[in-house]
Amino acid sequence: MNRLYPHPIIAREGWPIIGGGLALSLLVSMCCGWWSLPFWVFTVFALQFFRDPAREIPQNPEAVLSPVDGRIVVVERARDPYRDVDALKISIFMNVFNVHSQKSPADCTVTKVVYNKGKFVNADLDKASTENERNAVLATTASGREITFVQVAGLVARRILCYTQAGAKLSRGERYGFIRFGSRVDMYLPVDAQAQVAIGDKVNGVSTVLARLPLTAPQIESEPESEPALQTAPVETAANPSAEQRQIEAVAAKIQAAVQDVLKD
């Protein structure tokens, strides 16, 4: 079984629900005929909700992939609250008709997993990022860049499932979590990442490139060393007369003495 898609076609999280719906639908059909229609509708809905199709995975090492299906609701410069650094934030909102299986956006090593309890407001709202129940995965890419991807519960989705932990290595496109019935995923990338999507765009999990992240961080240019200040010659004042000035004063004194001698004669 493919390691990147260990639960082909239908996510394992839906097996009990789909199995129960199918059994109940068959039972009601045998007993009540057309009265079983609502149960069949529910079973079909569960089948489409828990679908988990395999997708082509772009292998460009600079490509950061969308971890889920959905619609882009945020593309902005923001503060990564888990690392306390400036970041490029990209948020994806999932409605009940999207695939809700979450997959790794890059080849990376998980460094930390942070779970926060919270509310269950509409995941389409910006405040859901800070107020709702959420689970953040902090990771370092194969090239050493730090990224953060956050599972955010929604108004209906009240169960975040995360199957990874600190120290785990994830391949791009590898399944790591699931959120049931509508939710949101926030991505925090280094500020030099270049967004490839805009607000309102629809994205497909692991097949859509959200951003391009250079393999190396930009070099911070060091400030040039300041040149030593030029030494200026001391300003000559009356207290420090020049040789020329002393000669002039000496000649003037001789002339004055000669004039006085003439006057005495």
Curated annotation (Swiss-Prot):
Its main location: membrane. One of its GO terms (cellular component) is plasma membrane. Residues 218-242 are annotated as: Disordered. The keyword Lipid biosynthesis applies. Pathway: Phospholipid metabolism; phosphatidylethanolamine biosynthesis; phosphatidylethanolamine from CDP-diacylglycerol: step 2/2. Keywords: Cell membrane, Decarboxylase, Lipid biosynthesis, Lipid metabolism, Lyase, Membrane, Phospholipid biosynthesis, Phospholipid metabolism, Pyruvate, Zymogen. It is found in: Cell membrane. It is a peripheral membrane protein. Belongs to the phosphatidylserine decarboxylase family. PSD-A subfamily. This is Phosphatidylserine decarboxylase proenzyme. The gene is psd.
